[in-house]
């Protein structure tokens, strides 16, 4: 699948899937450009449908400067539009991570950030990199 470029100003309300719009992937620094991997949208839609609950993207695409500001890796998949940090309403992040791993058994990144890792509800990082990567903070 392809990585597509969108404009926050022009494409904000564009529906990418039944549950996701372009604006949900925006960089939190307010930049107009948003990169989004079509495969990431498919992955997130599968997670949404499996749990039957809203999926909140807490971090999607990041510019290099914003990635540095938030302490992201220099090789972060967020820079390419291939990653999202997510929370599924009323769902344990470890259950979300386990399901994401089942969707990508030999590829993709899944990071587990349980409740103790800083955000009250914890979160899960998912990305569509071609190789397999798993970690827990």
Question: Which role fits each region the language model picked out?
Answer:
Residues 35-37, 62-67, 88-90, 101-104:
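A short linear-motif detector with a strong N-terminal bias
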Residues 41-71:
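Extended, low-complexity, intrinsically disordered C-terminal regulatory tails
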Residues 36-43, 53, 66, 82, ...:
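Amphipathic alpha-helical interface surfaces
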Residues 12, 20, 65, 70, ...:
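Solvent-exposed, flexible loop/coil residues
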Residues 75, 79-84, 88-137:
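Catalytic cores and adjacent binding grooves of peptidoglycan-active enzymes
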Residues 1-50, 119, 130-137:
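Extracytoplasmic cell-surface/polysaccharide-interacting catalytic and binding patches
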Residues 28-30, 55-61, 96-99:
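N-terminal start-of-chain detector that recognizes signal peptides
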């Amino acid at each position: 699948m392809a990585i597509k470029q969108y404009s926050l100003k022009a494409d904000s309300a564009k529906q990418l899937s039944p549950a996701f719009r372009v604006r949900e992937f925006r960089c939190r620094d307010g930049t107009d450009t948003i990169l989004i991997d079509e495969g990431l949208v498919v992955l997130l839609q599968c997670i949404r449908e499996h749990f039957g609950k809203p999926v909140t993207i807490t971090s999607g695409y990041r510019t290099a400067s914003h990635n540095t500001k938030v302490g992201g890796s220099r090789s972060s998949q967020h820079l390419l539009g291939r990653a999202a940090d997510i929370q599924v309403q009323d769902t344990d992040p470890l259950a979300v991570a386990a399901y994401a791993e089942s969707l990508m058994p030999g590829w993709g990144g899944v990071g587990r950030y349980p409740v103790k890792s800083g955000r009250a509800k914890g979160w899960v990082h998912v990305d569509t990199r071609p190789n397999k990567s798993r970690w827990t903070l």
